[in-house]
Each structure stands twice: as structure tokens, then as C-alpha cells.
């Protein structure tokens, strides 16, 4: 097993027991994951769905991305209070022609939706010319989740890419499309 770099201080199955709907229901999982892109000020979200088990699910956006410090302060905090720390409106990378957009996120739960598909997933997030790539795992010891691998490299632009190998559940394209259409297609800037 890889060395743990960072860890929270909760029981191994804390997320599964506490946030059962986001780690068990595919439609809720995708809704939460795309809501994270919305909250990051993304105008585009690309989703790749697997056709069979063990293929990757990829969700990539052009949102604001995170620095390593922001990742530590936001992603690694259980039940992160988004409104208290970032306000009720989202951050755009460019305000040009953009209306204010209320954030969906409140309780720091949606990021754990990747666990609906596997006990490990990758987060690649970039801004200010630096990309941080993390391998997250729930089997990293006594913590709720851990970063078991962290790589840093150069990358222009801004955004976040989540990827996970579909092992536990395989999302159906029609179901995902319908769920996301109900929640997000009303905004022409998204």
C-alpha cells in the first residue's frame, strides 16, 4: 500500500455511513459532481462514461481550479462549509458578461460522490500555471479518506478533472443525461 501523505481523522467507513446517498445513488453522485463544477465557475463540463466495468468515468471542467493550499483547505476538510469560507456566490475566472451565480454547495459532501464508483479516485486541478494531481483513497488507514499520491506539474489555464475506474457501479448514459438536464441545462452560460 502507498504511503499516506495527508489524512483526516475519522473512521475508515465514516463517509459511507454518513453520506450514504452520494456514495450509493448514481444520479445523486453525478448531480453532486457537476454541482461542484458549477460552484467552481465552470462554463463547460465534459463527462466521459464507461461502457463496461473497470473503464474510467471522467468529469472535467474549466472552472477556477484549486491550488494545493485550497485543495487542503476545501477538499480535505470533512463537511467543509462552503458558504462560510467562500460566500454564497461562485468565483468566475473572468467576470466578463457573467451574471451572479449562487453556489449549490453548502456542506462539503458532493466531492465524496466519486466513492459511488470505487474506493480510489483521482483529482487533477490546475490554476496559476500549476497542476496538482492527487490519488484519493478510503483505504489509507484510520482516516475517512487520504491522499496516497501527490504529483505537481505545469499546466496552463484552470480547471479540475476527476477520474475513477467504475468498479462498484456503472452509470447509464440515459439516466445521467436526464438527471443533469433537469438540474443544469436552464443556464445558457453553463
List the predicted regions and their residue ranges:
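N-terminal assembly/transducer modules of large multi-domain enzymes
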Residues: 38, 42, 147-190
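GHKL (Bergerat-fold) ATPase N-terminal catalytic module, capturing the glycine-rich phosphate-binding loop
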Residues: 1-161
